């Protein structure tokens, strides 16, 4: 089992020449490779895409075997991938998914980091995060609009919709956290973000997600103060330990205007630098002394949450951004760790009730002009949504593509399938140079059960019911998605979530029209269904408006 290979540099093919037998198998092949592009992945030579140890394949032998299988797969065959390893090719039919993926799933009693790590070290499992092991990661852009929407809503609720002259404090510049500084600036706020790895800071600078950096807190605060005074949003990366910096801010009596965190706290061994440790010591002991690392990280997380709770008590709008930091602190003895809310119940759930979530697409041509054309098509088909148009304009101006050109765009039930059909028609007519793939994050309205994040504080108490993502995966399979994935532990770690993903290819064919219409209607409809079942009036109204047939829910 080879998990580190310094000789490997993987990039997706572009253009219209196929390596596989059809676009329906070329697409997952390119997206797998795109996940490991050095401009996309956090640690590509270790197959790590983002989120601690979120991998695209179990090991390099499995990666090679997946590539070989996709290259030879026929139009009526389906490849099964078990925790990053290809385990079977079976005869199905042309409208069935070409790939079915299950990553990190464990029987609930054994669904914890200790047991998973035993399996992982034996080469029997792989942590797929959400979009790492499901081959639809698009770099930090994948979360930037959701983060932007959250920050905008924080501004609406706490500062009358105006974040000019305000600043956000946060931690983490990894694959997910790296979206925070750009999202904050887009929302009108300055951002001070602490990151312990210089390489992560450098990547965000290189890709345009971060404006500047320093290793001096005094300098960082000076830059933030100047930007707020001038009301010119600026993002500043600070090299350091976020828990240490929060303690220092409290000592100095300095309060941010908004507070959150996106370190990889969900993984106490691989995702969080203990206070007082160097990165080099941490990296060495993550292999040689895992229990020591975990204990030290949990103690630091408890300190981190204590500081956040203090700021919360001082009136600073404080929110958990879904990395399970509160849970880790609770287990470390901080009984009131959940005194401040998660971002979904606080700011995002009304969108989920209407099936609105992180719709994304990728141009397999590799040509940014294809994304420009699809951006224009979105504006044409959704002409009256000024907020969406503003987002697309900002994205075109400010977001640098990582790997294959892509776009993220939060739209919901009734719009997703219209956009998919329009994109497919653009491929058919030749307006787009090659097919596009449409997917989403597993963080969506109907595809995840995560009591400390997406399904926190559900109205009916159904936070932990995970039938919903299973039904979502089954329905997307039956509807004809090109590949479907079912994962465990993404975002918040082992034992705390189950979630499903789907991707569908717009290859320009009439057969694709039928699959697109089914998948891109049914997928967001499951989110409306799930929230209607929980008793949300917004969701029941949406279900009635869209004519959903929900016999046990709408009576």
Curated annotation (Swiss-Prot):
GO cellular component, one term: cytoplasm
Pfam families reported in the protein's UniProt record: Urocanase, Urocanase_C, Urocanase_N
Class of this enzyme: lyase
Residues forming the catalytic site: 409
Record keywords, A-Z: Cytoplasm, Histidine metabolism, Lyase, NAD
Binding site for NAD(+): 51-52, 129, 175-177, 195, 262-266, 272-273, 321, 491
Main function: Catalyzes the conversion of urocanate to 4-imidazolone-5-propionate.
Protein's UniProt name: Urocanate hydratase
